[in-house]
């Protein structure tokens, strides 16, 4: 109760609600997340070998790096794809993704994991503590994944925690790249980054979904600033 900063009644009410929604199950002395087909699907997706399209996105993202930069790499399977292609060992990386931290460590790249609550299915750190810690950094470049992109080219998030992290990274980075496969376009979600913020982001993808001469093709992938796709630049 002290850790959650909530009253016992609030905690009990939340547990009952989560149990009714099928998210958790009780056992003697506590609760645990209930194994569901959706959870198994997420875990399967995250353990699959990456395909060539996502590898191309990763190569192009890694090619944007420069020595001595402070970089943010967000959680997610697509952002993880850039790490094997990083050639700059003297960069400094902040991340909220545990797989990202492990991959950076194997490359002997200096990395720091943000603190916060552990989000199991994405193996990431999220929450108020994560956001507050993030406020202390200003990045040369940030590389983010997303739950999707809607028809207005706004970045979508699965929950409020991811949404806050995306907004803050965009605002506190000189350059921000969104790494998404073509399957992420034309989606909807409750949480979206406002257009005036999303417009500053450069998409890196495996297919130029929106017809525009602004797309730049490199290393088998495509990139373009969102504001240019919208005709605002």
Protein language model features and the residues they cover:
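HTH-adjacent hinge/linker in prokaryotic transcriptional regulators
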Residues: 2-5, 9-75, 83-88, 92, ...
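Conserved phosphate- and dinucleotide-binding cores of soluble alpha/beta proteins
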Residues: 5, 102-233
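Alpha-helix capping/helix-boundary segments
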Residues: 10, 17, 77-79, 99-100, ...
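A generic structural-conservation signal
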Residues: 27-28, 95, 113, 225
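Residues at secondary-structure transition points
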Residues: 48-52, 56, 77, 95, ...
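Short, contiguous clusters of charged residues that form electrostatic/catalytic patches at enzyme active sites
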Residues: 52-59, 63, 80, 128, ...
